[in-house]
Amino acid sequence: MLLTTIAATSCDNANDWTVDAAHNRLFSCDLSGVTPEDIGTEATLEFKTVKGAEYYLIEVSKDTLYNDIEMGSTATSIIYGEDKSIKESPYTMTGLDSSTKYYLRLKAMSGNTPESKWSYLSDYSFKTKSEQIFEEISTADLTENSVVLHWLANAEVTKLEILKGEEVKVTKDLTNDNEAVTNGTITIDGLEAQTNYTAKIYKDNVVRGTIGFTTFAAVPSADLVYRMTADENLSNELLAEITAQCEGTSITIAMPAGTTNKYGEALELVDGYSYTFFGIAGEKKPVIAISTITLKNNALIKFQNVELNADGINAEGTAKTNEYIINQSAAAVVDNITFEDCDIIGFKNSIVRIQSSSSIEFKKVVFNGCYIKGQNLASKYYVLHNNSGKFGEVEYNNTTFDCTGYRGLFYSENKDCTSINITDCTIYNIPASGQYVIDFKSTNNGATNGIIINNTIFAKVQDASAAKGIRSNSVQTFDNVWTTNDFKLTGNQFSGTVTAFDGTSTDLFENPAAGDFTIKSYNFGGRLNAGAIKWRMTE
């Protein structure tokens, strides 16, 4: 009975036994588990110490470890504690490779008593987290066809790859590039304009950093490309002068980086012309802060790589907050209105509104790669708002909606539209109290070709007691759509398939209240493929 009692309690730290009488050795330790650290090259082991042990040895290896394997005999073995420094738990192991599976074992040691048997994890192994030695890529590091990459100086790295999708487009051998390794920087040329790339840096076959970037767009071609100077300001007079120079019908107005254009009157586009307002690449996008824009019969109006800001002026030059970008009351048919790679900041009401005229039709409205932030006050309108005319196709692509102040994404007052497509979007803090994400005012109208939502996150509502989903007669088709548990709808629930994340928006994102929607939770099933692309995890 005594031996049975000893065997049952021998691993209990509360007993007074230090030696297994049957085998005259230290007891083996219970391993609680390993926590991989965010740094990627470290992991912390917790274990129960045993009495009589003076120190502990830990061995990890990329190769399988078991009792018949002599300590340190595998090609990838790392041994911690040979200097007798490990005397307590927990212990943080350093010098590991990131994103790598390791096997682990531990034994207790003493100068007076034979060592314990090896102790193993319940599943024998653990995996380190992905490492990130790349620094953030700034606009100053990018051009139309190049990128400057920065990483931890003097880091152990051997190779760098640039991928377009899954295809490796550039490979750099760093083993003999002492300058790049010492300084932690390299310039990659020969890239395509306006293209998404991924950079990976390796130590042998282990990834030590992964970062995505998009090269700048080239100035769009047109019948006339007009390059504004830094001392010019967008106005009706300048627009008329530019249009008069055009021998065709399409005009690109290229605006210098870092400039600000404030105009206190409605900017009147000329009938029959297409206009692209393009921001030249630089450290800061050019700012357009004009009272509003009045459209005519235009094939295209496009804003690309600019900041559209509500911080404007009135006709007398006094500061005011603008309410709309487009607030159309005059008859007009416009084929395409596009916002691409734009920051749209602080408007009191809609970005595009059709007022009470049935003679207004916007055949296609697109948001692509934008960041949209509303005012911190209650708005009367939706991001897109139709009182009497007609929207055709509506597309929200790869866009972040930080929607404090907006009622919802889309409103059409008893009028059908052609379609609504939402893809790769992060949508935060809508709808407003008593409002809808999408609203056709009744269930008698809707998007005739359906409402399609893919790879999108809905996080938080403005009022959890009175938020509603979609009011329409549209077929709703969802794929890879996620909600946080602070996105609660009290009516007009989504009929498409939605997956719930077990956490709030603050559990999912780094700092949503401050506009940082970087996904931080490894428990989120859509971390690689949901939400606006810039915020996703890479692995």
Predicted feature residues:
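Conserved aromatic anchor
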Residues: 41-52, 145-156
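Extracellular beta-rich repeat passengers
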Residues: 267, 275, 279-516, 521-539
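Proline-enriched interdomain boundary motifs that mark the N-terminal boundary
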Residues: 24-34, 130-138, 222
